[in-house]
């Protein structure tokens, strides 16, 4: 079912590519996969304030190439490139092979699902009202060309006693259509009341066979609100 599965894995090899690009035999595969997970967790913790969208890992010929997609490349690189050199040395110690680090700038962070989710989580940790944070993110995404966006928050919202789920949607988010370019991400806000989970779906348009990204057209003006038992598209 399109509503239940991760939209990224559902569209893998159809409209999306792998985030880890390497080959290994059955003996080395588990260790290399665990290493990729550890590297991503390390980078996300290290670059928490750099608005990191995604991290791509390649392993050509006894080396590693890591591409960091970020909305704030200056924070990653640092003054005169000092921070990126320190980061490269730490990654080489962890992976045990020469590491090349590439930085790619995210041109429109307002329609990037991971950056939106992390931004909402950061606001919730600063005690911003969850409805205000969600609606502001939706307005920015639709203004900059997204065709649809859906945001869901779950937990003790605004510190209530019983945890619940609220979601908002503007435009359309077709989860069953494989050619639809749907970006999806999750994040967590660690508040004084507990953990609040955030899920974000961003629909950027339909993609043609072999196309990597699509330019969104004029957005459709429509908003829906749902509660705990609401069914979403």
UniProtKB/Swiss-Prot annotation:
Annotated SUPFAM superfamilies: Prokaryotic type KH domain (KH-domain type II), Ribosomal protein S3 C-terminal domain
Region (Disordered): 209-233
Leader sequence segment: none
GO molecular function: mRNA binding; rRNA binding; structural constituent of ribosome
Function, in words: Binds the lower part of the 30S subunit head. Binds mRNA in the 70S ribosome, positioning it for translation.
Quaternary structure annotation from Swiss-Prot or TrEMBL: Part of the 30S ribosomal subunit. Forms a tight complex with proteins S10 and S14.
HAMAP family documented for this protein: Ribosomal_uS3_B
CDD domains the record matches: KH-II_30S_S3
Similarity remark: Belongs to the universal ribosomal protein uS3 family.
UniProt keyword list: Ribonucleoprotein, Ribosomal protein, RNA-binding, rRNA-binding
Protein name: Small ribosomal subunit protein uS3
UniProt-listed InterPro entries: KH_dom, KH_dom-like_a/b, KH_dom_type_2, KH_sf_prok-type, Ribosomal_S3_C_sf, Ribosomal_uS3_bac-typ, Ribosomal_uS3_C, Ribosomal_uS3_CS
Domain KH type-2: 39-107
Native organism taxonomy: Bacteria, Pseudomonadati, Pseudomonadota, Betaproteobacteria, Neisseriales
One record GO biological process: translation
GO CC aspect terms: cytosolic small ribosomal subunit
